[in-house]
Every structure is written in structure tokens, then in C-alpha cells.
């Protein structure tokens, strides 16, 4: 079974609502329950932050963690669970810095994990499928930086 590395950073996808405030509290193991049968997962709980509060140093730490995960040749790809407020910026930084041809897929959620409309599980499943269905011949960018965002069926 392929190994997929999952880096958790917080965000709405890892949040529950307490007294009207969304707080990131869920670790990777909790978030991957619905997809546990799809792959072997290596979970790295890097940080637990609201992505609106991320600084450049946090984004750099995420990109560095991706690079470290690719140090293992057995890793099929990396999924980053991230908040939507700064996902674009962090994924762009990773795109600029990653040279490995294996996939990096960012995903998150619009609704907290305890909301009946929670989209996190579907987005995680999409991210896992994106990594597992990756074809280096068809999908790889020869210049490196194979970063994608998987969200809402896209």
C-alpha cells in the first residue's frame, strides 16, 4: 500500500466551534478516519493555527516539512491540511521551493468538523485520490513544483 504523508497545520478543517469561535483542535489521526483504508498514512502534526495568523516563518516551516517528507523515497506524495485564509500563499511558496516531482496537495474546509455541512472529509478524500492517481508522465511539471489545491470536487 502506498505511503502518503499528511502534514497538519490547523485551519477550519481541524476546527470545532466553541462558544461561536472556530478553534483548531483536531489532529491528523482524527481527520483521516474516513480515508484510513485508502492508503498508509504518515502523519506529521506540524502546527495547530488559524491560517489567518500564519506568518512567513510558519509558511516556510510548512514548505520545509514537505521537503523533509520527500527525503523518504517511499512517500508517494504529501498532503497539507491547511486553513483557507492563507492556503494560496503557502501553496505558492511551496510551488516555488519544491523541486521533487512527486505531488503536493493542499486542502482545507469551509465548515468546521462539527458543522453538519462539513466539507473537510470530502476534501481530504479528494486530496488522497489526487495523490494516489498521480501520473508522473501526465501530471509532472518538468520544472518541478508539482503543487495542487484539491477543494470542492476540483
Model-found features: residue ranges?
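Active-site histidine-anchored catalytic micro-motif
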Residues: 1-154
